[in-house]
Amino acid sequence: TDFAPSAKAFQEEAQKRIRELHMYDVLRADRCISVNSLEARVPFGDLDFVKYVMAIDPEMKLNKYGKGKYLLRHAFEKGDYLPHDILWREKAAFSDAVGHSMVDYLKEYAETVYTQEEFEEKRAKYTHAQPFTKESLLYREIFEKYYPGQSQMIVDFWMPNKSWEGCNVNDPSARVLANYGDSGK
């Protein structure tokens, strides 16, 4: 949302993301954690907290300070909740917690699985949520193997809002966006 062209667009995108969150990161985290008999604690997922944050004037949430998540960081400035270098460190992509090497390895592996001709041919058979990279085709074929004909369960790809300047990318990772910092490299 750092790239939102207006407060209204920011709020609309935030509302859309919240409506769809259960289908992306929340579902993935729940499944990955539950399979190991663990339970996730998600303090920023508290419904009262989410309602509170969504009620804040979106104009205040725009990135006017050159630092993403400014209001959240500012809220933790007073007191000793977090060390200063942690509180103000560069922004990192949530999905990169698995490590850059694993993400890069999967992309490289997908490139070896399909020729460009095979990619074009195989992706064309999917009319809903059509794969747009060899990596996304690899994931789609794995999904279809275990859940054939169930693709309608997936609304769409979790991607930046491509209509916003700086967000027309073909990778769901925030690593490809200009506001992504050096954290985690």
Question: How should each PLM-predicted stretch be described?
Answer:
Residues 146, 150, 154:
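Phosphate/ATP-binding catalytic cores across multiple sugar-kinase/actin-like superfamilies
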